[in-house]
């Protein structure tokens, strides 16, 4: 490679951008000496300097159109290419159906590509929130793509032919949380950056007042659920397992074969009794009516794409028990069993001869039953309309933040019965509710923080259970059997029960313990492992945690193991004292806690720094812990105002650049990262984050001020004279055009915006909406050159 370096004037090991490599290749082809193709080819593969910026969905996707040109331009000054990979719902659907599309329409499977990249030391991926699609969302995306000329097959609700089963399997590979388990080849480190936390204390968000007479509570099962039925084993050796259902008549049905497991891996099996679930739900509907509180259910039908839609269907049928008693056979025959929500039932009634009669029965049940919590009071959308509308990790903190209230049909706040059927984690929310009822709302101006170290690598625990979750077709016994024929786990089950198995590999557990010790050491905070002694899985994890803690120097550290309820109480007691506590949790509580505490502390989980140190040495940088904000898109379409806050992107980008500097020895990347952190802090302190109201600063204006601040910081820093020289005129040009550019961003607001699509927006139209200032665009494009 020396001749290439001699020719280019670069030192050996310097990261080289794509444009430079293309230039060298062209010169080689023109016969220039000193650039042997063999060596150039090696250099192209070996020193690829790039950051992958994911294209996702909804509000983060729209923000990407505005922010990514800035990121590309600034990163290029350090020789770093920023490349896009499309892992949007639309992109993932298209990647599964190449054989249905024209050659020009076909797209690569970017998710599979990134999954492989995440297992290499070179990985540097910025991951924005994406849709975890429910069936209604899948159908809407498919219909939109079909309208755009893609010859996709319809989503088959009840596949019967081999072709329909194949189509359904392809769509199901995209459904639910299909993205994160593929990319998360490491454990999770999520925390509020100091600048963000300080800003939240200085400018506290609104918290609803709690009353000691509040009737809000969580309702959860006390037996026969996933928590109480769990059995768990630690594998003594590598093995291949089979999951089968042995019927009452002795017939065997294989539910899952060729399940490869490793020595030290924790394997669990458990089930939810459908009969017990129905009894529990009937009691809660009656309780809500008697107590005069809103009835609501809080599940995660997106991530838990097999089990939770079934649970949601049970809730719908329990609330409308009289309707299903009378019309259940007809509704089930039409595929309207409640699992896709009330909206899908209402839409399907149009095709039934007595649809109006059944609709009247639903209306009567709504009028006579307990009041339902509303997703949108103005539009009459209830908590039971769409499974993906109410997601527990976001909906419960929002309720707690709003005095324990949800919204009723009149658009008023009201106390709520929050039904969370499985009791594994419900106690966390009840503990916080009880504390708020006794001591009042938390104070964001003084409260401490609860960062999280989460076990999630290699599809750990429940979030990797989808391919091992089954709605049991007949009474019998589910057995998990090893290759020698020994039964490791078994459960007596009944038709309709939901049975699932989980896997948690040993290497991720060891890495999780190491990360917890590291974060406790670096932060000086106590760390609590949230493990439930009543759960078989958690008892096994406790044994392993105690074992692996001995591998680390924990002298002077405060590391303990407590049940989730006890850990919650200790953490919130410390929060009220202004003290900080790391929560070290499994995969589900990682998800729940990184919404619960940030929403209480900061008002949103989108402002969290979310780093995944990949086990192979690369880095995955997630932009906050929030979702993809469909209501933000709705507002943009209606009045051309995008209130999405890209703070999560700013934080992730800085960490990505810093990781690049450390792994590639790129000093310029470190300068960019430090300058970006200072620019972000200035943005917060000067109040240049997006407003919720049209006619005020939005996402685009916020991006302008981030760019201006970043350019100023780079122009005035003294660590890299080249960067200072590059950005001095950029900062000057941006400052001179500030009034013109920001006026443009305000002037376009107030009227509808045409994106040319929701799941698959038009590139041309969306660019026009998100980059309306030709002056700003010209300055950024000038940096690239």
Describe the function of each predicted region.
Residues 4-6, 13, 20, 29:
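Short hydrophobic alpha-helical segments enriched in small aliphatic residues
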Residues 30-48:
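Short, Lys/Arg-enriched N-terminal segments with co-localized hydrophobic residues
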Residues 49-313, 325-544, 548-560, 564-566, ...:
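Extended, well-ordered protein cores
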Residues 661, 680-684, 715, 735-738, ...:
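A structural signal for well-ordered alpha-helices, especially hydrophobic packing surfaces
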Residues 724-732:
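Short, charged, amphipathic alpha-helical segments
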Residues 742-758:
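A glycine-biased, small/acidic residue-tolerant capping/turn segment at secondary-structure junctions
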